Curated annotation (Swiss-Prot):
The keyword Ribonucleoprotein applies. CDD domains: Ribosomal_L20. HAMAP family: Ribosomal_bL20. SUPFAM superfamilies: Ribosomal protein L20. This is Large ribosomal subunit protein bL20. The gene is rplT. Binds directly to 23S ribosomal RNA and is necessary for the in vitro assembly process of the 50S ribosomal subunit. It is not involved in the protein synthesizing functions of that subunit. One of its GO terms (biological process) is ribosomal large subunit assembly. InterPro entries: Ribosomal_bL20, RIBOSOMAL_L20_CS, Ribosomal_protein_bL20_C. GO terms for cellular component: ribonucleoprotein complex; ribosome.
Length: 134
């Protein structure tokens, strides 16, 4: 049985690591040990920031919705509350896009939200509102 030497696989691994470290500064781009540490760390940051990215986008959508809704005299929280009470289920990404690209449709949603809030203030319960809407 032939002896297995691992030079080929080691070389391939090293090459893969150095390729991933391309563009790094200093020794990190051309020595295996430093490059491996830098690449491992960069993967940790990438993993973490994929989660953070979702949070950042949600915050951006909420800021945009809040800015658009304030033009109609509501706050973000009251607007979302009104949408929930009116039974309108639209996610924040879509609301944000509507506020930017389709202001008329967004205005209709704001009016529906206001109507739901005003009706519930007068009527008192959500069940009465839902039966009145249907």
């Amino acid at each position: 049985m032939a002896r297995v030497k691992r030079g080929v696989t080691s070389h391939a691994k090293h090459k893969k690591t150095l390729k991933a470290a391309k563009g790094f500064y200093g020794r990190r781009k051309n020595t295996i040990r430093a490059a491996k540490a830098a690449v491992d760390r960069s993967k940790q940051f990438a993993y973490r920031d994929r989660k953070v990215n979702k949070r950042n986008f949600r915050a951006l959508w909420i800021q945009r919705i809040n800015a658009a809704v304030r033009e109609f005299g509501l706050t973000y929280g009251r607007f979302i509350d009104g949408l929930n009470k009116a039974g309108i289920e639209v996610d924040r990404k879509v609301l944000s896009d509507m506020a930017i690209h389709e202001p008329a449709a967004f205005g209709a949603l704001v009016e529906a939200s206001k109507k739901a809030l005003a009706y519930l203030k007068d009527a008192g319960t959500a069940n009465e509102f839902e039966s009145a809407v249907r």
